[in-house]
Amino acid sequence: MNIFLTGVTVLVLTASSAVQAHDTESYEHVVATPIEINEQSATNVGQEYRYPSGEPVLLAYRIVVKPGQKTSWHKHSVPLFAYIMSGALEIDYGSKGIKKFKKGMGFVEAIDWCHQGLGVGDEDAVILGLYLAENSPDSAKPVICDGPQ
């Protein structure tokens, strides 16, 4: 029995190492490639975040920012995971600096921190936004700010 368990452990560890080395997992001929997330346990400006206390709801949006287009200064009151599907985006966080994101990058957006997005490059910045919101009207809607913090 011990030899069997040792063999299983070696196989599991070997398979685990192979998965980590290739950063993809295969299950029933379906390949799942992890999406790199900048600062997984904090927002991209270093804030800890918590899920909303009310009834949870996951909301998904396809957001498009044209080249040269600026968003208004705004902030989010709930956690938002953003994934850049195409193009590039520059976000001004005022005293926290400017961060650039391009196709294939993911991040947890700042919470209750005023910021402004700018579409950069020659193509639309297309973002998949997943809001971990509350099941209440406008819980995922950005709040307009006067300017940078």
What are these regions (language model features)?
Residues 6-16:
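Bacterial N-terminal signal peptides
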Residues 112-138:
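Ligand-binding loop in jelly-roll beta-barrel domains
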Residues 53-57, 68-81:
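A short beta-loop-beta micro-motif enriched in histidine and acidic residues
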Residues 18-57, 143-149:
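A short, N-terminal "cap"/entry segment at the start of jelly-roll beta-barrel domains
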Residues 65, 95-112:
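Short acidic-glycine-tyrosine-enriched beta hairpin
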Residues 71-76, 93, 118-120:
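Short histidine-centered beta-strand/loop micro-motifs
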